[in-house]
């Protein structure tokens, strides 16, 4: 008599997916709500905007610094194990943020929170395919994309409501029980794993140089840095030294060989470009809607949430579409919609009112939902199982580098175009001008991503045709 196969019951899969879903939602929630926390922090701590900006930048630096390490350690030590540790660190850091007595304490806690978030994002993306059959991989990516968008959508609205009623500490306290719930679901139902076959220690020199390069990059992009051009020079030098050290390492920190596939390389670069646009949109929206139309912050938060909410509703249909027509057509469709939306925002007329801003934003986020689901499915889904964590780490790294560039670089450009060190003092016309010019630049970035998607696909088709010719000759 044959031995029956042991299959996990549906409830186990549901709890496991719930844990991965919360591990995807919470980092996005922690990131998006900070935009509305900044004004309250400025009033309580009495610090300038340049210091407040580091509440955002520190979180992104924490995420970005650990994305590749999380993927490597996940492949080597076990993805479930590292996901549990990362979620625990995120919960602890959320409590430390709420207890922060100074802006320096808060920035340090946000860095730690970002480190935990990196493990959550990378490992949830890498493990999603393990809980569903290959035919439903697009569905699982759509689920994570939906929850990611939900986190981005809930951040501004919940942040605004909680800050108004209970102070800026309340949003951080809300993250604590949710993180503990994610930890419980993952602990109970995610499949246990063994350490990977990879051996050898972590290249600490490469890691230190990478963190130094990222820190200098963040300082260089922060407007008003007293160090002048030195952070930019430091970032360049540290990156050159990192490439030299890492290329000579026995087990390099960045698995750059994984970028050899044309489609994967194009998807990772496009992810960075799109992420820079989306985070800049979240940063610009509150200042434009509040300053140009005198809307209260509660209304502003609800309006900003509508775009990510639409993306959340589009995530599952996007996954369904990917499963049926393939990832590449959906990537092109999503980027095309985003280009149209960015052009409309670049031509924005303030006489159209808040609705004139909101409608293109809705189109932009719908396109983003299509792009993210299809791109994640193509980049991570096509990787081999042993390297899926590393590929997910590269994808998350590119996205967070884009977010860092958008928050510091495009945000600084927007402030410079407004012509005021303090954006609260900018006039409605100055804010409208800064918004139009910034979105004109984002349209160019999105056009570059669309061109890149087409170029990489043609390269893949050329490789396939060349392989076919060589097979025919043999």
Kindly give the residue locations of the regions a language model identified.
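Transmembrane-helix signature of multi-pass solute transporters
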Residues: 89-99, 116, 178-185, 237-241, ...
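Structural signature of transmembrane alpha-helices in multi-pass secondary transporters
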Residues: 24-28, 56-59, 63, 90, ...
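Helix-loop-helix hairpins in multi-pass membrane proteins, especially solute transporters
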Residues: 67-69, 75-205, 351, 411
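12-transmembrane solute porter fold
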Residues: 13-36, 49, 124, 165-174, ...
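Intrinsic disorder in cytosolic terminal tails and internal cytosolic loops
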Residues: 1-12, 454-474
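Extracellular/periplasmic helix-loop-helix junction of adjacent transmembrane segments
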Residues: 37-65, 105-107, 293, 298-302
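Helix-terminus/helix-capping segments at the ends of transmembrane helices and short amphipathic helices
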Residues: 39-42, 128-133, 138, 142, ...
């Amino acid at each position: 008599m044959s031995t029956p196969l042991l299959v996990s019951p549906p409830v186990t899969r549901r709890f496991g997916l719930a844990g991965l879903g919360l591990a995807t939602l919470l980092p996005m929630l922690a990131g998006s709500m900070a935009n509305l926390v900044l004004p309250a922090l400025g009033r309580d701590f009495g610090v300038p905007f340049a210091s407040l900006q580091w509440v955002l930048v520190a979180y992104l630096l924490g995420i970005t610094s650990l994305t590749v390490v999380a993927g490597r350690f996940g492949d080597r030590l076990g993805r479930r194990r590292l996901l549990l540790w990362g979620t625990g660190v995120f919960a602890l850091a959320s409590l430390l943020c709420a207890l922060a007595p100074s802006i320096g304490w808060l920035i340090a806690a946000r860095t730690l929170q970002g480190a935990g978030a990196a493990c959550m994002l990378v490992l949830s993306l890498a493990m999603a395919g393990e809980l569903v059959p290959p035919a439903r991989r697009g569905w699982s990516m759509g689920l994570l994309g939906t929850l990611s968008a939900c986190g981005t959508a809930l951040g501004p609205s919940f942040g605004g409501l909680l800050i108004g009623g209970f102070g800026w500490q309340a949003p951080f306290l809300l993250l604590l029980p949710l993180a503990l719930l994610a930890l419980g679901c993952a602990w109970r139902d995610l499949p246990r794993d063994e350490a990977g076959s990879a051996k050898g220690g972590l290249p600490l020199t490469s890691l230190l140089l990478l963190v130094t390069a990222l820190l200098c990059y963040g300082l260089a992009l922060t407007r008003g840095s007293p160090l002048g051009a030195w952070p930019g020079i430091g970032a360049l030098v540290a990156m050159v030294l990192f490439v030299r050290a890492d290329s000579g390492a026995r087990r390099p920190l960045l698995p750059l060989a994984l970028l050899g596939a044309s489609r994967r390389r194009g998807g990772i670069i496009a992810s960075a470009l799109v992420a820079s646009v989306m985070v800049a949109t979240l940063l610009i929206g509150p200042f434009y809607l509040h300053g140009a139309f005198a809307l209260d912050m509660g209304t502003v938060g609800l309006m900003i949430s509508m775009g990510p909410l639409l993306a959340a509703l589009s995530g599952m249909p996007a996954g369904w579409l990917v499963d049926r027509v393939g990832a590449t057509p959906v990537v092109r469709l999503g980027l095309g919609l985003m280009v149209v939306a960015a052009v409309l925002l670049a031509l924005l007329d303030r006489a159209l009112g808040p609705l004139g801003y909101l409608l293109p934003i809705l189109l932009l986020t719908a396109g983003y939902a299509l792009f993210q689901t299809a791109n994640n499915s193509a980049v991570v889904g096509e990787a081999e199982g042993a390297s899926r964590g590393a590929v997910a780490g590269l994808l998350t790294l590119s996205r967070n580098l884009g977010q860092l560039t958008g928050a510091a670089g495009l945000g600084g450009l927007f402030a410079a175009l407004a012509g005021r060190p303090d954006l609260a003092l900018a006039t409605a016309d100055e804010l409208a001008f800064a918004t139009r010019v910034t979105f004109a630049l984002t349209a160019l970035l999105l056009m570059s991503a669309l061109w890149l998607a087409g170029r990489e696909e043609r390269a893949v088709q050329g490789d396939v045709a060349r392989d076919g010719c060589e097979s025919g000759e043999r």
